[in-house]
Swiss-Prot record:
Keywords in alphabetical order: Aminoacyl-tRNA synthetase, ATP-binding, Cytoplasm, Ligase, Nucleotide-binding, Protein biosynthesis
Higher taxonomy: Bacteria, Bacillati, Bacillota, Bacilli, Lactobacillales
Protein name stated in the entry: Aspartate--tRNA ligase
UniProt main location, coarse: cytoplasm
Catalytic reaction(s) noted: tRNA(Asp) + L-aspartate + ATP = L-aspartyl-tRNA(Asp) + AMP + diphosphate
Originating organism: Lactococcus lactis subsp. lactis (strain IL1403) (Streptococcus lactis)
Gene3D superfamilies: Bira Bifunctional Protein, Domain 2, GAD-like domain, Nucleic acid-binding proteins
Length: 590
């Protein structure tokens, strides 16, 4: 029979009506002669009741045979439920079955299909099709759909055109590792899967499309963590003739619509703006979590006046004050914080407790004569804990920024119901790479540098003290609760400036033409001023759903080894396939 309703949508308005529902058995109970079946579909659960003494024989037999995860078709009359369940939408009714057909049977599942069950991550991924039956996972995936629907509605209404860009691209440097695809036709040559549609969307601007968007898969071969996957989805935008501020305003309106549509939350516009240097100096991060204070304080001038060699020889001395928490941190717990600081590059972690008007523990003996100065500078009150890092500016910021997040969680300083958006602006154009021993582009090499700092592009990029560090970019990141939600910039639209930028990054003209010749040539044909942004869809939905791993909002993700336990991808392929591609494998143990 044709399904008349989703099981989870049947309420009191259907009383005394005959309905047909189809779904999975979530639970079956035989109580005092009555058989109760909780039937589940994507919308929720409805209770089916069968009285074997009054029901038709085939109905009673099917109800008796049904087990968890059997697929059933049930027809029956909607009646008022004697014992109501206010926790579910259908809790006021049940269906008296007049017909039951078993559409499919099921083996015993490797884990219970319910939310409050502990299952190993790889087991969940191996049986992802079962994991997705759980109500929480269904909710996450439908929330993702609601998010993309809201995004499309806004962008379509704002005059954006959805354009697909190619997946088989040219491999270019200045990014993460590419996923390479060998060409059978052009032997010995490779395509690269796109890390983003960056260059293609810029070319669409010179093609005259003016406003482009795409919700698109991207690929990066990088080490994985909770908010990264080898394949991910981004909301990709590009516009012509808009200023940096206009692009930000447009993005804010888009996000405000999503927040209202998906979460029912009205967000305040415009979002706060924070300069990159302020984010690093006060939060120790270029993606600051502004839901709580615990700011970094630069104590360099004061700290270098005391007789403590570690402070005197450091480039900077910075600190955070954990208010009214000295008694909550034992030496053992401070040692754990010290290890975390070291993992973030610090040589160590100095500390003191302020108790009864004086410093105690840690480096207190070095601060004793300057107690009043430190108390005034840090605005200390009784039972405060002070943590210091003495190092280079970058290390001090990074180490204390990481500790700030850890302590914020430990001390319950974070309101997890909040959604704090902000823009991080005024970025440096380049960042130093110790591994490469040169400056690299902080975003990408197509970002427009500010007019005031373009003259520094001619500086040598192989010295950390180079004037390249003075170049600023028309770049902007949007941050939500300590996560980079997306990033964008105005782009270079003249060939001369683009060649200067590539030269600053160490490209010889010949190499620049080899890698980016198609873009450089396009810049000779009337390229409009343009800019854009990309939002991480997986990360956005993860935060909307209150999760801490994007796997929870992706239907079929990879594990931390970039593998799929369900399909066993990646896998060995047949020798014949490799021969067709002219590929010979080296010893994988080498």
């Amino acid at each position: 029979m044709k399904r008349t309703n989703y099981a989870g949508n049947i309420t009191e308005e259907y009383l005394n009506q005959t309905v047909t529902v189809k779904g999975w058995v979530a639970k079956r109970r035989n109580l005092g002669g009555l058989i109760f079946i909780d039937l589940r579909d994507r919308e929720g659960i409805v209770q089916i009741v069968v009285n074997p003494e009054t029901a038709a024989a085939d109905v009673a037999e099917a109800a008796d045979k049904a087990r968890n995860e059997f697929v059933l078709e049930v027809t029956g009359k909607v009646v008022e439920r004697a014992s109501k369940n206010d926790k579910i939408k259908t809790g006021g009714i049940e269906i008296e079955a007049t017909a039951i057909e078993i559409l499919s049977t099921s083996k015993t599942t490797p884990f219970e299909i319910k939310d409050d069950v502990e299952v190993l991550d790889d087991t969940r991924l191996k049986y992802r099709y079962l994991d997705l039956r759980r109500p929480e996972m269904l909710k996450n995936i439908t929330m993702r759909h609601a998010t993309t629907r809201s995004i499309r509605e806004y962008l379509d209404g704002a005059g954006f055109i959805d354009v697909e860009t190619p997946f088989l691209n040219k491999s270019t440097p200045e990014g993460a590792r590419d996923y390479l695809v060998p060409s059978r036709v052009n032997k010995g040559e490779f395509y690269a899967l796109p890390q983003s549609p960056q260059l293609m969307k810029q070319l669409l601007m010179t093609a005259g499309l003016d406003r482009y968007y795409q919700i698109v898969k991207c690929f990066r071969d990088e080490d994985l963590r909770g908010d990264r996957q080898p394949e991910f989805t981004q909301v990709d935008l590009e516009t012509s003739f808009l200023s940096e501020e206009e692009i930000q305003d447009l993005t804010e309106e888009l996000i405000a619509k999503v927040m209202k549509d998906v979460k029912g939350i009205d967000v305040t516009l415009p979002f706060p703006r924070m300069k990159y240097d302020d984010a690093m100096n006060f939060y120790g991060s270029d993606k600051p979590d502004t839901r709580f204070e615990l700011l970094l304080t630069d104590l360099s001038a004061l700290a270098k006046t005391i007789d403590f060699k570690v402070f005197q020889e450091a480039e900077v001395v910075k600190a955070i004050v954990v208010k009214d928490a000295a008694d909550k941190y034992s030496r053992k717990s401070i040692d754990k914080l010290t290890e975390q600081a070291k993992q973030n590059g610090a040589k160590g972690l100095a500390w003191v407790k302020f108790e009864k008007g004086e410093f105690a523990g840690g480096v207190s003996k070095f601060l004793a004569e300057s107690t009043d100065s430190f108390v005034n500078e840090l605005k200390l009150t009784d039972n405060d804990l002070v943590l210091f890092v003495a190092d280079s500016l970058d290390v001090a910021n990074s180490a204390l920024g990481a500790l700030r997040l850890t302590i914020g969680k430990q001390q319950g300083l974070i309101d997890f119901r909040q959604f704090n958006f902000l823009w991080v602006i005024d970025w440096p154009m380049f960042e130093w790479s110790d591994e490469e021993e040169r400056y690299m582009s902080a975003h990408h090499p197509f970002t427009l540098p500010t007019k005031e700092t373009q003259a520094f592009l001619s500086a040598d990029g192989h010295s950390k003290d180079s004037d390249l560090k003075k170049v600023r970019a028309h770049a902007y990141d949007i941050v939500l609760n300590g996560y980079e939600l997306g990033g964008g910039s105005l782009r270079i639209n003249t060939r001369q400036l683009q060649e200067e930028m590539l030269s600053a990054l160490g490209f010889k003209l010949e190499d620049a033409n080899e890698q980016f010749g198609f873009l450089l040539e396009a810049l000779d044909y009337g390229f409009p001023p343009h800019g854009g942004l990309a939002l991480g869809l997986d990360r956005f939905v993860m935060l909307l759903a209150g999760k801490d791993n994007i796997r929870e909002v992706i239907a079929f993700p990879k594990n931390n080894k970039a593998s799929d336990p369900m399909t066993q991808a990646p896998s060995i392929v047949a020798e014949k396939q490799l021969e067709e591609l002219s590929i010979k494998l080296a010893n994988k143990d080498q």
